[in-house]
Design a protein with these regions (language model features):
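Acidic, metal-coordinating catalytic segment for phosphate/diphosphate chemistry
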Residues: 2-49
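Active-site-adjacent beta-strand/loop module that shapes the phosphate/pyrophosphate-binding cleft
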Residues: 108-129, 142, 159-160
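NUDIX/MutT-family hydrolases
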Residues: 130-161
């Protein structure tokens, strides 16, 4: 449930958690008691790219991230575009690279962010020029790149397996409970 969604976009009445009968039975959702609007809270489609550039894997560091984490190029689909068109657009916007070939790696749920990740392998060319949202990039040999145990890290692992590599995962320090 997205707690940030508090008011009806149709009439501005505060939303309430209201249980109603739906096709699958009774379901509690944020609904407008005044006009009946339902906030479905559907997952958001996110596009991700394992970029193969000059025979290596390109990972980038987002300006908003703490530390030195590098990850796949990702972004949201725009209305009216296909996933393939969207991932090519994101690659161009964020790295200035042109996409020569795309192949679907897989679709992954990312429950923590209420997202569905649609991941592609993209063979790209051109001169890397990062957008302001990225601060750095690195090129990794496929056999030495490390995956992360969440979201797009699983897409990278799947692509590595398809290339005959055994994925290695970064181990994050355990948080105190």
């Amino acid at each position: 449930m997205n707690p940030a969604f508090k008011f009806c976009p149709s009439c501005a009445t505060p939303l309430a958690l209201i249980t109603q009968s739906e096709d699958g039975g009774d379901k509690a959702r944020l609904r407008c008691p005044a006009c009946g609007f339902t906030h479905w809270n559907n997952p958001t489609p996110v596009l991700a790219a394992v970029i193969e550039y000059q025979g290596k894997v390109l990972l980038a560091q987002n300006a908003a991230w703490p530390g030195k984490m590098f990850a796949l190029i990702t972004g949201f689909m725009e209305a009216g575009e296909t996933p393939e068109g969207g991932v090519s657009r994101e690659i161009k916007e964020e790295t200035n690279l042109s996409t020569d070939a795309l192949k679907l790696i897989g679709v992954y749920d990312f429950q923590r962010m209420n997202q569905i990740i649609i991941a592609y392998h993209a063979v790209c060319h051109g001169e890397v020029r990062l957008s302001p949202e990225l601060v750095d990039y690195r090129l990794f040999e496929p056999e030495s790149v490390k995956c992360w145990p969440a979201g797009t890290g699983y897409a990278l692992a799947e692509w590595l397996k398809s290339r005959g590599h055994t994925p290695q995962f970064v181990e994050f320090p355990k948080r105190d409970s």
